[in-house]
């Protein structure tokens, strides 16, 4: 009897039907949309999903997967798995992105985003702009303003040793359904067997599944830094090092979870969709904000596969932190050999004046000398010189021109060309594509110190748009620039960027020194969409 009761309890605990019902309700439109693009129709029903899961658990169906033939039922299961990974891929800490001024969004989005603005910024919804230009590079503001307060830096590159069993080990913390985990394992093994083949064998669903596996691997490493911050707070692991410090100097700040991509800002429907999932993840799954405590200065930044952890501490603490990270990688993430992990601890003060490459951007280290003279009553103290180190971010214009040359918008020397494949679109649609392309480049590089050099890139896009329209209407470029196109739209006015838009990537409670940057630039900030 005891065994029967335990079996019933385990069956009710592992096989939760409400999970499948929830996934079907939230993914019905997505699966239907993808099924139409792949020229097949999948009727979504709870019985069909359970039937597909039962077939996937049989041995003779696993051989079908090895041959590379996915039926309609497996395509539906693959879509459901991808959406199920959305709940798992919610970052432990992320950033909020305020919208543009000219666009209107629901009040719920405004209340969730405008929780704490930077002291250098003003509320954009009151018709005011920021006092200084910030963009995606505002995540690097700590390099310019606060990096001199940190004396040691720990850096590493994430080596994606993606194995199906490692991903399943991570998923088990969030999903308790044995059948669904078994589906994960079969699909992941099927994907890994086809990684060495040509990309033509993959479809959109498989690409999304591979990207989800990569994100799960990276977010698990981000969770390690969040847990280690809490251990520093409790002074359990690092008590011998932090013993001289007083606990009263720690001040608590809360990092709220809210993540909106750049594509979501441009599309209101996707924006509402992400807000809904954010509320659902907080209420139903109980994800609460994580409390962090600052100690001196601490900064964590991850961009794609490179992460940086800088703080104000001694060398013993940083080496201990690096040792714990390497042990976490070897025991938890499957890197059984230390030569896969190369965490480096070096002194920031040893950075030279030459240009270096950090996280894919050019960084230049400058030194400023401040002359200080103190006078007490009639006594004048000797003159002292304070040396302050700054790190500047440069925008390589030749790389931008090279990217435009790749998409046939200009020559290798920067001479504008017409876009032949866009001549089949309407006039407004052509201008809108060039406008979005220009705004995306400006937003990305507006945080650099030489952002004024982007005016040359603006001229390239402007004349490339004019040449595309001239090629379409069989006229000259001068006539296109001087006359108005459809709906009284002038190209000179469309590409006028006097209004300064900005994207803030600051956290709540800006006055604190703690910074945790979670940047996912992979497949989110593209120069243009595929034709």
Curated annotation (Swiss-Prot):
A Pfam family recorded for this sequence: Intron_maturas2
Domain of life: Eukaryota
Transmembrane segments: none
GO molecular function, one term: RNA binding
Main location: plastid
Cellular location(s): Plastid, Chloroplast
Assigned GO CC terms: chloroplast
GO biological process terms held by the UniProt record: mRNA processing; RNA splicing; tRNA processing
Keywords: Chloroplast, mRNA processing, Plastid, RNA-binding, tRNA processing
InterPro entries, A to Z: Domain_X, Maturase_MatK, Maturase_MatK_N
Family: Belongs to the intron maturase 2 family. MatK subfamily.
PANTHER family per the UniProt record, alphabetical: MATURASE K (PTHR34811:SF1)
HAMAP family attached to this UniProt entry: MatK (MF_01390)
Function: Usually encoded in the trnK tRNA gene intron. Probably assists in splicing its own and other chloroplast group II introns.
Protein name per Swiss-Prot or TrEMBL: Maturase K
Organism of this sequence: Zygnema circumcarinatum (Green alga)
């Amino acid at each position: 009897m005891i065994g029967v009761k335990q079996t019933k309890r385990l069956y009710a605990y592992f096989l939760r039907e409400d999970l499948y019902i929830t996934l079907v309700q939230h993914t019905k439109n997505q699966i239907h949309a993808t099924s139409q693009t792949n020229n097949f129709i999948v009727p979504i029903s709870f019985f069909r999903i359970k039937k597909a899961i039962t077939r996937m658990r049989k041995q003779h169906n696993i051989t079908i997967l090895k041959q590379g033939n996915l039926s309609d039922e497996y395509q539906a299961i693959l879509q459901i798995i991808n959406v199920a990974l959305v709940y798992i891929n919610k970052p432990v800490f992320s950033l909020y992105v305020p919208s543009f001024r000219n666009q209107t969004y629901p009040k719920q989005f405004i209340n969730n985003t405008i929780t704490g603005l930077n002291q250098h910024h003003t509320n954009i919804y009151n018709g005011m702009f920021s006092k200084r230009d910030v963009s995606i590079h505002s995540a690097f503001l700590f390099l310019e303003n606060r990096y001199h307060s940190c004396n040691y830096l720990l850096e590493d590159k994430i080596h994606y040793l993606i194995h199906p069993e490692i991903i399943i080990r991570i998923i088990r913390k969030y999903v308790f359904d044995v059948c669904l985990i078994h589906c994960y394992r079969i699909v992941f093994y099927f994907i890994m067997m086809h990684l060495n083949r040509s990309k033509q064998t993959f479809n959109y669903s498989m690409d999304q599944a591979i990207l989800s596996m990569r994100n799960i691997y990276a977010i698990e490493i981000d969770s390690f830094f969040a847990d280690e911050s809490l251990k520093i707070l409790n002074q359990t692991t690092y008590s011998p090092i932090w013993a001289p410090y007083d606990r009263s100097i720690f001040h608590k700040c809360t990092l709220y979870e809210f993540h909106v991509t750049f594509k979501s800002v441009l599309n209101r429907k996707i924006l509402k969709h992400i807000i809904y999932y954010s509320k659902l993840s907080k209420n139903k799954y109980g994800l609460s904000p994580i409390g962090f405590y600052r100690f001196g200065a601490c900064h964590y930044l991850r961009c794609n596969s490179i992460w940086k952890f800088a703080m104000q501490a001694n060398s013993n603490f940083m080496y201990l932190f690096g040792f714990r990270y390497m042990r976490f990688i070897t025991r938890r993430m499957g890197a059984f050999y230390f030569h896969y992990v190369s965490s480096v601890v070096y002194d920031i003060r040893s950075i030279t004046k030459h240009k270096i490459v950090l996280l894919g951007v050019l960084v230049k280290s400058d030194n400023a000398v401040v002359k200080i003279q103190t006078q007490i009553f009639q006594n004048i103290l000797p003159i002292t010189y304070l040396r302050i180190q700054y790190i500047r971010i440069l925008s390589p214009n030749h790389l931008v021109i090279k990217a435009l040359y790749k998409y046939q918008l200009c020559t290798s020397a920067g001479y504008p060309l017409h876009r032949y494949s866009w001549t089949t679109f309407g006039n407004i649609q052509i201008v809108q594509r060039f406008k979005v392309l220009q705004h995306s480049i400006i937003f990305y590089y507006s945080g650099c110190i030489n952002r004024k050099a982007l005016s040359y890139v603006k001229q390239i896009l402007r004349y490339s748009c004019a040449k595309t329209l001239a090629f379409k209407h069989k006229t000259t470029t001068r006539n296109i620039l001087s006359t108005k196109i459809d709906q009284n739209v002038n190209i000179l006015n469309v590409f006028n960027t006097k209004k300064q838009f900005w994207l803030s990537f600051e956290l709540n409670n800006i006055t604190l020194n703690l910074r945790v940057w979670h940047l996912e630039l992979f497949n989110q900030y593209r120069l243009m969409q595929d034709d």
